[in-house]
Curated annotation (Swiss-Prot):
Belongs to the universal ribosomal protein uL6 family. GO terms for cellular component: cytosolic large ribosomal subunit. Keywords: Ribonucleoprotein, Ribosomal protein, RNA-binding, rRNA-binding. GO terms for biological process: cytoplasmic translation. This is Large ribosomal subunit protein uL6. The lineage of its organism: Bacteria, Pseudomonadati, Pseudomonadota, Gammaproteobacteria, Lysobacterales. InterPro entries: Ribosomal_uL6-like (IPR000702), Ribosomal_uL6-like_a/b-dom_sf (IPR036789), Ribosomal_uL6_a/b-dom (IPR020040), Ribosomal_uL6_bac-type (IPR019906), Ribosomal_uL6_CS (IPR002358).
Length: 175
């Protein structure tokens, strides 16, 4: 069996894991997440620990993947995930308008981004955006969508970048 699949998933206090024939749901203080249960992967719950096993040798790799997704779901409903973005450039600003995010990124018009359900956006400063939510995949997807409006360019580094991202700079053309 894969090394990832052998490791059990621990369930913190307040997190409830339900396994149905076609669906796996994780409920916690930050919400509820569901996952379609793949055929050939068995999930056994023993107290506050969930273990996964494969019914078929061809499903061993899938078992490791499902275990990683399940661990992220448990972490998401208990702690949540967040991704920070920074706006670099003169006149680049972000502001909240109710639940919508308004971005001034050098275009002739402000961009308005509507947060999907289950995702909260906040702007601690005019040049910072924080994306939070229980689903790791959706948090990353929303952050990537916002970054995609104006990705950082390599000459001056202007654009929307992840807080922990390092932009590799290029030297300007010599005359």
């Amino acid at each position: 069996m894969s090394r990832v699949a052998k490791k059990p998933v621990s369930l913190p206090k307040g997190v409830e894991l339900k396994v149905q024939p076609e669906l796996v749901s994780v409920k916690g203080p930050k919400g509820t997440l569901t996952l379609p249960k793949p055929a050939g992967v068995e999930i056994a719950i023993d107290g506050d620990v969930a273990t996964l096993s494969a019914n078929d040798p061809s499903q061993i790799a899938l078992t490791g993947t499902v275990r990683a997704i399940l661990a992220n779901m448990v972490k998401g409903v208990s702690e949540g995930f967040e991704r920070k973005l920074e706006l670099v450039g003169v006149g680049y600003r972000a502001a909240m308008q109710g639940k919508d995010l308004s971005l001034a990124l050098g275009f002739s018009h402000p961009l308005v981004f509507v947060a999907p359900e289950g995702i909260t956006l906040s702007t601690p400063t005019q040049t910072e955006i924080v994306v939070q939510g229980a689903d790791k995949q959706r948090v990353g997807e929303v952050a990537a969508k916002i970054r995609g409006f104006r990705p950082p360019e390599p000459y001056k580094g202007k654009g929307v970048k992840y807080a922990d991202e390092v932009i590799i700079r290029k030297e300007a053309k010599k005359a």
